Amino acid sequence: MKKMTRVLGITIITAVGLVACGQTNTDHKNHESKEGKKTEQKEMKMNQEVTAPKEMNQGASNDLLTTSLKNVTRLNTNDPLQMAVLTSQTIWPATHKENQPGAVILVPVNEWQLGIASADLIHHPNNGPILFIEKEKVPEMTLKEIKRLNPLGTKDGTQIMVMGDIGAAALEQLKDYKVKQIKETDPAIFAKDVDKEYADITGSYPNSVIIGSSEEEGRLYTTPAVNWISHMPEPLLYTEKNKVPEATIEALKMRKDKANIYVLGPEKIISKEVEKELSKYGKVTRISGETPVENSIAFAKFKDEKTKFGWGFTKPGHGVSFVSNKTPDLAVAGAPFSHMGKHAPVILLEEGKASQPVYDFLATIQPKFKDDPTLGPYNHGFLLGSTSDISFETQGILDERLEIVQESGQGHGGH
């Protein structure tokens, strides 16, 4: 009897164990199925996030009263002179001493090489905007903005810094201010002179430099440098595709062979031979993308952790400027958006539209919240250009892609 009881007990235990095991297998399969669905849903959501919208509302741009949105502020002009003034008024209200500029930088409107390189002087301690001038005169719009700003002056009292060679009549218009001029017009020599001017003001040369192309085919690849050099002390020095100008070599030698040299652009713009030549004067790192759009994104994402050079935008919570590749002058005018406020690098838009690389980049920095969107972080965009250059539809897409979203994918209704 005891034997039978023992056998029966073992049988029951075994049966229960088998049932439990069967239940565990079923639960595991259900768990795997749920996890698989979650992964699939997440992948679908990610794919949705990084592609263009499928259904557009054709009437969205009709009867607009504003061209600025919750996440994207538009400076609505394609005139470089006006863009410079709009930027100046946005960054420097000049209502009191603490938000007046030190010195205003005046740049000939059609000389992009001078314009980009001179942005190094936007940074502290000068702390002032770029405004545009013509060779023989200072436009009325620019004069009025200088008067409104009432620049405080730098350490030596300079209120206006004139870039390039302008006529006597234009200088006469500035007679009420203390003016300093960098007269050089050759791009490489001019960039070297700006580098020296900044070193004279601050007392030392920064170890890091950006090397960009001064040639027309390289213009869009060099353009993103304008925001970094207005944000930080590092200058832009120029090169040609296959030859390093003597002026650039002289500037590099001031770093005593210890320069951190960041080449901006692919080998089709700045050759491997130039990179090799530059390596004689320090450590060379190339930052590049195949197209101007991809190049601007590569620069926005790059960070040298050792030297702290670079934006390093790979996580949420940033400001970003957007400019059409058809209007690069506007990037120079808007460079101060990286000097103060949101400290925004510039992303180029192919013919004013968001392309796949832009969608991919914005997906990596889109903010997400768990249960409280008021905690941030937040992104914000500055759109530099009129609606004829960058459409309201494109602006709406960028606004949505910069918006903070719930990490569960439920949207704002889930909190």
Regions from the language model: what does each represent?
Residues 17-20:
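C-terminal motif of bacterial Sec signal peptides marking the signal peptidase cleavage site
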Residues 23-415:
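Extracellular glycan-binding segments that recognize GlcNAc-based cell-wall polysaccharides
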